[in-house]
A protein has these predicted regions:
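Beta-loop-alpha module in the N-terminal Rossmann-like domain of NAD(P)-dependent dehydrogenases
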Residues: 1-49
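Residue-level signal for alpha-helix termini/capping positions
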Residues: 24-25, 51, 77-80
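Contiguous beta-strand/loop segments that form the cofactor/metal-binding neighborhood of enzyme cores
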Residues: 126-214
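Rossmann-fold dehydrogenase core element
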Residues: 45-62, 82-86
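A short helix->loop->beta-strand "cap" motif at the edges of active sites that frequently abuts
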Residues: 26-28, 53-55, 179-181
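Short beta->alpha connector loops at strand-helix junctions that form conserved
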Residues: 33-35, 61, 190
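Predominantly a Rossmann-like dinucleotide-binding segment in NAD(P)-dependent oxidoreductases
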Residues: 63-163
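Hydrophobic residues in well-ordered beta-strands that form the structural core
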Residues: 9, 32, 57-59, 88, ...
Length: 215
């Protein structure tokens, strides 16, 4: 046994809520990987538990604390690119079975309670809404691009995963009314890409985010 003041929860997505609740009820400060819960009810329960325990509770993704995004928000506030017309965000990769360093079975990424939207989509949605605020309407198209996947490296190299239970390719649209809209691409269907992580298009100019933290 050991005592501690703060817990960092980096377990698999389906385990987040149970572990978070145990930590909060024990009076521990908490930093949780995303998503902290799979339903509004779970997240609300965690927030109320943190309030009751008087502890600090935060979660990833922390994009709005990034220097490049904070600088972009300042450029927008200063009117440097004019009125925002469109935001395009790309948060995709080829699937967790491609990770070079993986030593654990990645099957759970393709099972209910996980998937590309929870794993990757939250990044794009956080960045987009952090800049534009809440959307007035949201739409989505989704497909299963690879119903069977093969682990490429690591401990489970060569293992096949049945991946037909969840969508792995998403295009999410956000309507902000007037002239402004946003698109978030998310999924496990891009083995490689040179697409910018985010682009903000204004009436006077464009802000482009590249993957090394520069704009």
């Amino acid at each position: 046994k050991c005592d501690f003041e703060i817990l960092m929860n980096t377990t698999s997505i389906p385990a987040h809520h149970e572990i978070n609740m145990k930590a909060l009820r024990a009076g521990k400060h908490l930093y949780s990987q995303k998503p902290v819960g799979l339903t509004v009810e779970e997240v609300t329960e965690q927030i109320e538990a943190a309030k009751a325990a008087g502890v600090k509770y935060t979660a990833s993704p922390i994009h709005m604390l990034r220097d490049d995004i904070r600088f972009a928000k300042k450029l927008i506030a200063d009117g440097c690119i004019g009125e925002i017309m469109k935001v395009h965000t790309n948060v995709c990769h080829g699937g967790p079975e491609y990770f070079q360093y993986r030593t654990a079975d990645p099957t759970w990424f393709h099972r209910p309670g996980s998937g590309a939207l929870y794993d990757m989509g939250v990044h794009g949605l956080t960045m987009t809404t952090g800049i534009l605020g809440p959307a007035k309407a949201v739409g989505c198209m989704a497909k299963i691009s690879e119903p069977v996947r093969t682990v490429r490296t690591g401990t489970f190299d060569g293992m096949q995963i049945q991946a037909d239970q969840l969508y792995d390719n998403y295009i999410i649209t956000l309507d902000y009314g007037e002239r402004t809209m946003a698109v978030v691409e998310s999924g496990f269907c891009q083995k490689d890409s040179r697409a910018p992580q985010m682009e903000i298009f204004g009436t006077k100019g464009t802000i482009t985010f590249v993957n090394n933290g520069n704009i």
